[in-house]
UniProtKB/Swiss-Prot annotation:
Organism listed in the record: Nicotiana tabacum
Official protein name in the record: ATP synthase delta chain, chloroplastic
GO biological process: photosynthetic electron transport in photosystem I; photosynthetic electron transport in photosystem II; proton motive force-driven ATP synthesis
InterPro entries: ATP_synth_OSCP/delta_N_sf, ATPase_OSCP/d_CS, ATPase_OSCP/dsu
Transit peptide boundaries: 1-60
Amino acid sequence: MAALQQTPITFQSRSPPPTQIISGPTAKLSFSGGLKLPKLTIKLRSNRTSRRGGGAAGSKMVASAAGSYANALADIAKSNGTLEQTTADLEKIEKISDDEAVFNFFVSPIVGEEKKRELVDEIVSSSSIQPHVANFLNILVDMKRVELIKEIVKEFEKVYNTLTDTELAVVTSVVKLESQHLAQIAKGVQRLTGSKNVRIKTVIDESLVAGFTIRYGNSGSKLIDMSVKKQLEDIAAQLEIGDIQLAV
């Protein structure tokens, strides 16, 4: 992690190596989220890249490494006074990395670092990412740790929430909720937790049928379930009739 802590203002990544020549069958990289990507080509692979290590020990190592990167980035954001903007940047990056093609491109061992940096540059310019976050992404490319990005985002959220006395509430619903409804939910979570601030993250899940759920607390340990799915499950349990299947 020494490379991340060389300066309190910016990250510095290594100079890009010569372009790696890729031979064999190729496919154009596309992104379903609407991001305009550079014209890059990657070699097709028959196996899918895994996002996780195996076992409890592997999970602990991933969490530890992600926490170290997240804390280093948080130190930079604090010194720059950009905690809020950095959090927003990481949320953008997390959504982009959800695309399987983008993620597999970044973690592929047969794609050269120069090509990966081209993709970083495109993401940075199209999503208005701050320079220190862009440098952070390039460091992950240098260190071959891009697969940790989602864990890093989670760890950074924890650091941000601690620094700002913020409670994170994840609201899951069938359809997008209106802003006034989310504001009411935020006030309710604030009363329950006593936190100074509440951040709302929204998730769409059609399996809930109707209503919504709210997860908050340490690692989302507390749940308020106001969904029709939960009500139907409770009714089924009381009647001992098993799962209720709804006609679509």
